[in-house]
Every structure is written in C-alpha cells, then in structure tokens.
C-alpha cells in the first residue's frame, strides 16, 4: 500500500510586508521546507516559505514512510508583484529546492525524496485592485526512496 501526501507552501519576498499581509501569512514564520543553511532570520535569503498545508513539515520523517515507494506532491506557490520579479524569485527557489532534494545529511526530513517531474504554470491573482499579485506554481511529484537495508535471516 502506497501513501500519497500533498504539501502546499507559499513563497514571497521577505521584505514585501504588504504582500505578505495580503497573502495572510504576515507573522507565520515557521520554516516549512528548511533549505540548507537558510532560515528566515538569514538576511541573505530574500524570500520566506511558509506552510499552508500539512505533511512532512509537521514532524513526519522518512521513517514514517517505510515500506512501499510513496509519492509526495509538493506545490510551492510563488507570489510577487511583477512577472519579472516572480520569474527571478521562482528561479532562486527552484535552484534551492533542487539543492535541498540532493542533500544527503542524516536528519533532513525530506532528504530521501527524489523529484521525478515538475511543471510550471502562471496564473494572475489580484488581492487588491491597485496591487496585482502574480503567482507561479512549482509542482514537484516526488518519490520517497526506502533506503533502509533489509536484514538477512540467515
């Protein structure tokens, strides 16, 4: 029996407090996907990623998925004020997520997930008529590898 989990994250530029307020994530500073050596207090990280759903960010680890190969659908909804800003932000996040999937340190909650495919789609969203917000969805279909070794009964 395989398990499928859907996780949704929202990413936006950290300094754009008005946009964060419009997205209703203003003070939600929990790191949903802990990118390597990056957290929300790090001035070099230009964006925040916050959880809008439940899944592996709730404390579940790969050990809870032992057995059949399981799949996880991860959607990162990237929000920005302009299409150009959105493209730049989405590209940075894509690179960081790709790096994160390749991380192999023990203890990383998602380090055994391998992205099988991802696709992009633009959809404009307006929360305030004077401040349009562009969205890009980064969708990752992930396969959870079971790296545990089986013990021989011999």
Model-identified regions with their sequence ranges:
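Conserved acidic
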Residues: 1, 5, 85, 132
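Small/polar-rich, solvent-exposed N-terminal microdomains that initiate assembly or binding
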Residues: 1-64, 100, 104-106, 150-154
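Short, charged, surface-exposed interaction patches
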Residues: 40-69, 111-132
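Residue-level signal for secondary-structure boundary sites
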Residues: 58, 84-86, 146-150
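Extracellular/virion structural assembly segments
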Residues: 65-67, 79-103
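Oligomerization/assembly interface segments of phage tail-like spikes and tubes
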Residues: 67-84, 132-145
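Acidic-leaning, charged glycine-interspersed low-complexity segments
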Residues: 95-154
């Amino acid at each position: 029996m395989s398990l499928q989990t859907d996780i949704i994250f929202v990413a936006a530029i950290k300094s754009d407090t008005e946009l964060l307020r419009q997205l209703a994530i203003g003070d939600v500073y929990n790191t949903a996907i802990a990118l390597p050596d990056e957290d929300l207090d790090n001035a070099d990280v230009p964006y925040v990623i916050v959880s809008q759903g439940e899944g592996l960010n709730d404390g579940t680890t790969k050990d809870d998925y032992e057995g059949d190969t399981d799949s996880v659908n991860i959607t990162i909804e990237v929000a920005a004020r302009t299409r150009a800003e959105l493209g730049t932000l989405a590209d940075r996040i894509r690179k960081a997520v790709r790096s994160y999937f390749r991380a192999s340190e023990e203890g990383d909650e998602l380090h055994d997930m391998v992205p099988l495919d991802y696709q992009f789609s633009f959809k404009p969203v307006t929360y305030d008529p004077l401040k349009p917000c562009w969205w890009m969805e980064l969708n990752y279909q992930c396969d959870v590898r079971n790296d545990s070794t089986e013990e021989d009964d011999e």
